[in-house]
Each structure stands twice: as structure tokens, then as C-alpha cells.
Amino acid sequence: MSDLADWKAPPFPPRKVLEGHYCRLEPLDVAKHGAEIAAAFAGAGSVWTYLPAYAPKDRAEYEALLDSMVKNKDICPFAVIDKADNKAKGHLWLMEIRPAHGVFEVGFITYSPPLQRTRAATEAIYLTGDYGFGLGYRRFEWKCNNRNEPSKRAALRYGFKHEGLFRQHQVVKGENRDTAWYSIIDSEWPARKAAFERWLSSENFDAQGRQKVSLSSLNGNVA
């Protein structure tokens, strides 16, 4: 779509609760979520390998990091609440938010081991995408270190299209970062949304919790 004469820029995403079946995204609150998040990541230093920050050494350091996120008005940070036990087990941001162009990104996705590879983890991405497109955004971005193979596979599984590689894009923790770019645009979202919803349906899982149809196959991707 090239003619945008009637298009209006969406608002900056308000910090609000996003409710799902398996998870709930709550605006990050250090007092409310800090202790649970720090506990969930205890001993999980490898999670931070490709993130721009180093793994916090203790609860106080973790809460200071979370506080810096809350105070950053350029992002929309969420705690990921696992509704199985109503505990915060991760966090992510809406970031690189450019209302004038209708662009937003989900990033700094930080899932603790108990949250990884769960329906709640997948639903969190669905909720962020549905929120942004529901506000009127046109483009949903995913970017990652090109060395981060799990993140690249996840992007394809979720239905993001690979767009290319920004070589020597950043210096992170004293190392070169080539950045892989992925996106979903508004015209693609209805099909991606339907795939997410079909995969997340309880009918897609057997009595042992095993998926019947993969999200990758629903999106036509091989993760």
C-alpha cells in the first residue's frame, strides 16, 4: 500500500494490561514483579548471552535494571505473568516505537527457563502483535544478533519474514553484532493472528500437552 493520504499515525502504546489465556502482560512494576523475576532467573546467566545487558548478579542489581526500564519513556516494558501460578517469569518490551511511521518492535525478550518453550511464551508475542496492530501500527519488527540461532528460528515460527542482514550494525559487550531483521506487516497480520489463535487453542494439544499442529506449519515456515 503506497497511498497513505487517509492514514493517521497511531498513538504511542499506553502501558496497560494485556490479558491472554496462558499469560498476562502487565506494565512492568519493580515493587510488584522484581522479586519474582529475579528468583525466576537465578542461575540462568546464559539467557543474557545475546542481550545488550549483562546478567544481574543479585536481586538488587536486577531490580535496578528493571527500574531503568520502567523509567524509560521510549519503550513499553511488560512483565510476563504465567497464569498457571500467577508468577512473573520474564519480561519484554515494545520498543523502537515510531508512531509517525506506524512501526513497533518486540524486543529485549527475556524468558526464564520455566517460561521458555511454553504456550504462555508464545502467547506473549501474539499479545504484543495484536496490541500494536489493534492501535493502528503498520509494521511489527523483530531483530536479533545474527549469531542467535534460537531467536532467528523463533522469528520464523511466529510468522515474521526475514528481510536481510545489517552487517557490523552494532558493538555489543565488546563484540561485533550483525543484526538479522524480520517483520510482519499489517496486511499479513490477519493470517498470522489466525495461526497464533489456532495453535494456542486447547484443541491443538493432547492430554499430555503435546501440540498436534506446529505453529511453523500453520505459518508456512520451517523453524
Give the label of every model feature segment.
Residues M1-T118, Y131, L135, E175-A180, ...:
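GNAT-family acyltransferases
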Residues A121:
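Glycine-rich acyl-CoA binding loop
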Residues T128:
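Flexible ATP-lid and adjacent glycine-rich G1/G2 motifs of the Bergerat
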Residues F133-C144:
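Conserved GNAT acetyl-CoA-binding A-motif
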Residues W142-K152:
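Conserved beta-strand-loop-alpha-helix junction that forms the acyl-donor binding cleft
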Residues K161-E175:
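Conserved catalytic-core motifs of GNAT/GCN5-like acyltransferases
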Residues A154-A155, Y182:
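Conserved active-site tyrosine of GNAT-family acetyltransferases
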